Design a protein with these regions (language model features):
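Fe-S-dependent hydro-lyases/dehydratases of central metabolism
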Residues: 2-767
C-alpha cells in the first residue's frame, strides 16, 4: 500500500521486495546493479539493527538470538506484578539499572489508598533491590528514559509497548512483564533474528507539519498489510538530517502502532547535541548503515509531501489528511460510523454527523500529552499558534501535559506556559492518563482530538456497559492548537500563518537530582517492602496436564482485538496489583459475560486440584466426559485438566500489559485460539503465563466450534514435549469432531514454561 496525494505524488511508497541501500542514500532494487562482492546475506549484516543485536546476543547463533539488555524500565501499572513474579522466582538484586516510574495512575482517586500503596511498594523495592524510583508527576516513563537512560548502541527493555528510543541510537522493545522478569533473573530474551525494514526519509516537512503527521502517514501505509509486523524499522536517508531530535522522537514513539518489533535511526550532530544538553555526552554514538546494506523491504517517505493528518476512531491506522476530511465530511464520517458498528458490536448508538456545524467539523476537546505529544518542541509550537487567541467559553476544552518536569520548567521560563494559559489552556503535570483513559474522559458522544498514542474504542475512558461512548482522533500538537485557536473547528496548522520561535531547550538536572531516588545500583537487603492491602501474590498455577478439556467462553470476530478489549485500561488498572481483583474486569467492555463463564468452568479445575470430582463441581461436564470416554476411556483422574479458552481472529494489538493474558490465566484459561496473533509480545505473554497459543487456518466465519463448545485435546502435554507443530483436538458434541490446532514456533524454554504452567513455576523448578 502507498499513500498518494492528488496529482499522483507520493507521501509514502512501499517497495514490494528487498532492497540494497548504498552509502545510506542510494536505493537499489536489482542486485545486479550493486557493484560489490557481498551476498544478500552478508549485506544484511550491515544494517544498524544487526550490529546492535549482535553485540547483545549471548548465543553463537545469529538466527536464534538470546539477548541481554542494558537497562529496564517499567511504570506503575506493571512494576508490581513484575517484581512480585521475580520475587517468587528467586530475585535477590536488580542485576542492571531498572527504572520504576509512576506516571499512569498518579492522578486516579479510585480504590482509596491503592495507587499510592503501589508507589510505596515501588520505592521500597528500588531501595531493597538497587533500582531507580521516579515519583509521580516528575516524568512519563519514556521521557525519563530518553533524558536519563538511552545511549548509542544500547538496548532497553520496557514493560510498555511504546518503549522506543531508536531516534537516540537505542534499540528499545516493549514486552509483557515476564520478559523483564527473565532479565531480572539473568536470563535472556529469546527471538529469531527479525527482519529489518528501511524507512527512507527524504525531503523536509512543511511549516505546520509535525512528527505525528509523519507517524500517522507511515502507520496508515503499513499497519493493515503487516509490512513491518514484528520487524525492526531502521530510519535512514537524507531526510533524517532535516529533522530535530524532538521531531524524530515524536515519529519514533509511534512506530509501535505499526506492530513493529523495534526501531533504530541513524544518528548525527543533532542527536549528539541532545546528549550534550542532558549532560550525557559520553552516551552519544554515531550510527549509520554500512556502505552496502540489504533490507527486507523499504518504506519511502517524502517528508515534503506529508500533510497534517488525522487518525479517525477507532484505530491509529484509520488515517486521512485533515484537508481530505474537511472536504468530504459527510462521506468520511459515515464510513467511520460503519466501521464503528464492528468495533462497538452495536452496544450503543454511534453517530458523528452532529459534529458538522455550518459545514465544518466541530470537536469538544483537544489534548497534547504523554510520550508522544508532551515534548518541548510540540508544546512550544502549540503556544506559538495559540498566542494572542483564546479557545472560547463554550464546550471546547484544551489541556496540555508536558512529558517531564524539566520540560515543564523550561516552558515556564520561556513564557510558553503563560501563552497557553492566557488562551484558556489547562496545563497539567507529567501523566499518561489521556493516553489510556485515566483522566480527561470526554462527555458522552463528545469528540476529542489528541496528540497521544492510541484511539482504540473506550480507551479514552467511556464505558460501553453503561451506555457511554466518546471518540478520540489522533492529530499533531500543531493542528490541535490550530483547532483550539479556531475554538474547536477542525483546522490544520498549515492553514494558519504562524511565526514559530524555535526556542532552544535547556535541561535542569537538579529537578531529578532533588526528587528521583537512584540507588546507583546498590541494593539494601535490610529494607522492608511496603505492601498495601490490595497487593496480592499470584495464585498457584497448575502444570499442563496430560489431557486438556477447554470450553470456548468467548468468541470475537473483529478483524483485530486489542489488549484494551482483553483487559480495559483506565481506572480498571488501579487494581493491577491484585491479580484476581483485576481479572474481574477481563473482556468487560467486549464480552461482559466472559468472566462469569470462565469462573463457572474453573470450578472443575479447582475440584481437580482439591482431589475432588470435576463432574460433581460442574454438572454440564457429564455428557461431555461420557462422549470422550467412548473413545478415550482412560482419561480422567490424574491426567485431565479443565479450563477455558477464547477465540479471536487476531488478538493482541496494542499494549504490552501482561494482564491481557494473566487475567485469563487466573480465571482458568489454558489457551487462546486465533487465526494469527497481532503482536509477538501478546503471544509471549500467553506463553509466559502457561497458555497454549493455538492457531487455526480455518476462516473465522466457518469455525468448527462456537462459543459454549468444549474442545478436547488428548495428549497435549506429549505434543508440546515432542515439539509437534500440529496438535489434534476434538470438538465435543454428538460425536468427536477432529480439528487441527497449530502451536507455531516455540523455543525449548517456551515449551518448558507451558509444560510447567507459567514462568514462576518454571523458575522454581530450575532453582
Amino acid at each position: 500500500m502507498s499513500l498518494k496525494l492528488k496529482g499522483g505524488r507520493y507521501m509514502i511508497k512501499l517497495y514490494d521486495n528487498g532492497v540494497y541501500l548504498l552509502n545510506g542514500t542510494e536505493i537499489v532494487e536489482d542486485a545486479g546493479n550493486v557493484q560489490t562482492p557481498l551476498t544478500k546475506e552478508e549485506a544484511a549484516k550491515n544494517t544498524m539493527a544487526y550490529g546492535i543485536l549482535k553485540e547483545h546476543n549471548t548465543s553463537s547463533d545469529m538466527e536464534r538470538l538470546q539477548i541481554r539488555f542494558d537497562k529496564l524500565t517499567s511504570h506503575d501499572i506493571t512494576f508490581v506484578g513484575i517484581i512480585q513474579t521475580a520475587r517468587a522466582s528467586g530475585l535477590e538484586k536488580f542485576p542492571m539499572p531498572y527504572v520504576l516510574t509512576n506516571c499512569h495512575n498518579s492522578l486516579c482517586a479510585v480504590g482509596g489508598t491503592i495507587n499510592e500503596d503501589d508507589h510505596m511498594f515501588g520505592l521500597t523495592c528500588a531501595k531493597k533491590y538497587g533500582g531507580v524510583y521516579v515519583p509521580p508527576h516528575q516524568a512519563v516513563i519514556h521521557q525519563f528514559a530518553r533524558e536519563m537512560l538511552a545511549g548509542g548502541g544500547k538496548m532497553i527493555l520496557g514493560s510498555d509497548s511504546h518503549t522506543r528510543y531508536g531516534a537516540l541510537g537505542t534499540m528499545a522493545m516493549g514486552e509483557g512483564g515476564p520478559e523483564l522478569v527473565k532479565q531480572l533473573l539473568n536470563k535472556t530474551y529469546d527471538i529469531k533474528m527479525p527482519g529489518v525494514i528501511a524507512i527512507y526519509l527524504d525531503g523536509e516537512p512543511a511549516k505546520g507539519v509535525g512528527p505525528q503527521d509523519v507517524a500517522l502517514a507511515i502507520i496508515g501505509a503499513t499497519f493493515k498489510n503487516g509490512y513491518v509486523n514484528n520487524k525492526v524499522m531502521e530510519f535512514v536517508g537524507p531526510g533524517v538530517s532535516n529533522l530535530s531530535a524532538d521531531f524524530r522522537i515524536g515519529i519514533d514513539v509511534m512506530t509501535t502502532e505499526t506492530t513493529c518489533l523495534s526501531s533504530i535511526w541513524r544518528t548525527d550532530e543533532k542527536i549528539r547535541e541532545f546528549y550534550d544538553i542532558h549532560g550525557r555526552s559520553e552516551d552519544y554514538k554515531e550510527l549509520n548503515p554500512g556502505a552496502v546494506a540489504y533490507y527486507d523491504g523499504l518504506v519511502y517517505v517524502n517528508l515534503s509531501e506529508i500533510k497534517p493528518m488525522i487518525a479517525m476512531p477507532f484505530h491509529p491506522s484509520n488515517v486521512y489528511t485533515i484537508d481530505e476530511l474537511n472536504a468530504n465530511l459527510a462521506d468520511i464520517l459515515h464510513d467511520v460510523e460503519q466501521k464503528a458498528l464492528v468495533s462497538l458490536d452495536g452496544a450503543v448508538d454511534y453517530s458523528l454527523q452532529d459534529k458538522i456545524k455550518n459545514g465544518k467539523f466541530y470537536v469538544e476537546q483537544g489534548i497534547i500529552a504523554g510520550c508522544a505529544g508532551g515534548g518541548f518542541e510540540n508544546i512550544c509550537a502549540a503556544a506559538d499558534i495559540i498566542k494572542g487567541k483564546n479557545i472560547g467559553a463554550d464546550e471546547f476544552t484544551f489541556s496540555v501535559y508536558p512529558a517531564s518536569t524539566p520540560i515543564y520548567m523550561e516552558l515556564v521560563k520561556n513564557g510558553a506556559i503563560a501563552d497557553l494559559m492566557e488562551a484558556g489552556t489547562v496545563v497539567k503535570t507529567a501523566f499518561c492518563g489521556p493516553c489510556f483513559g485515566a483522566g480527561d474522559t470526554p462527555a458522552n458522544n463528545a469528540f476529542s482530538i489528541r496528540h497521544t498514542t492510541r484511539n482504540f474504542p473506550n480507551r479514552e475512558g467511556s464505558k460501553l456497559q453503561s451506555g457511554q461512548i466518546s471518540s478520540v482522533a489522533l492529530m499533531d500538537a500543531r493542528s490541535i492548537a490550530a483547532t483550539a485557536a479556531n475554538k474547536g473547528f477542525l483546522t490544520p496548522a498549515t492553514a494558519l500563518d504562524v511565526e514559530y520561535k524555535g526556542q532552544k531547550y535547556h535541561f535542569d538536572k537538579n529537578i531529578y537530582a532533588n526528587r528521583v531516588f537512584d540507588s546507583k545500583g546498590v541494593a539494601d537487603p535490610s529494607v522492608e517492602i511496603k505492601f498495601g492491602p490490595n497487593i496480592k501474590d499470584w495464585p498457584a498455577m497448575s502444570a499442563l496436564p496430560q489431557n486438556l478439556l477447554v470450553k470456548v467462553v468467548s468468541e470475537i470476530h473483529d478483524p483485530v482485538t486489542t489488549t484494551d478489549e482483553l483487559i480495559p485500561s483506565g481506572e480498571t488498572s488501579s487494581y493491577r496489583s491484585n491479580p484476581l481483583g483485576l481479572a474481574e474486569f477481563a473482556l468487560s467492555r467486549k464480552d461482559p459475560a466472559y468472566v462469569g463463564r470462565a469462573k463457572e468452568v474453573q470450578k472443575a479445575q479447582k475440584a481437580i486440584e482439591a482431589d475432588e470430582c470435576p463432574v460433581e463441581a460442574l454438572e454440564e461436564l457429564k455428557p461431555v466426559m461420557d462422549k470422550i470416554h467412548e473413545t478415550y476411556p482412560e482419561v480422567g483422574k490424574g491426567n485431565l485438566g479443565v479450563g477455558s479458552t477464547i477465540f479471536a481472529v487476531k488478538p493482541g494489538d496494542g499494549s504490552a500489559r501482561e494482564q491481557a493474558a494473566s487475567c485469563q490465566k487466573v480465571l482458568g484459561g489454558w489457551a487462546n485460539i486465533a487465526n494469527e496473533y497481532a503482536t509477538k509480545r501478546y503471544r509471549s505473554n500467553l506463553i509466559n503465563w502457561g497458555m497454549l497459543p493455538f492457531m487455526t487456518d480455518t476462516d473465522h466465519e466457518s469455525l468448527p466450534f462456537k462459543n459454549g463448545d468444549y474442545i478436547f485435546v488428548p495428549d497435549v502435554r506429549k505434543a508440546v514435549e515432542e515439539k509437534a507443530a500440529v496438535v489434534k483436538a476434538y470438538v465435543v458434541g454428538d460425536e468427536l469432531k477432529e480439528i487441527d490446532l497449530k502451536l507455531g514456533d516455540l523455543t525449548d524454554a517456551e515449551r518448558q514454561i507451558i509444560l510447567d504452567g507459567c514462568l514462576i513455576n518454571y523458575y522454581r523448578a530450575t532453582k
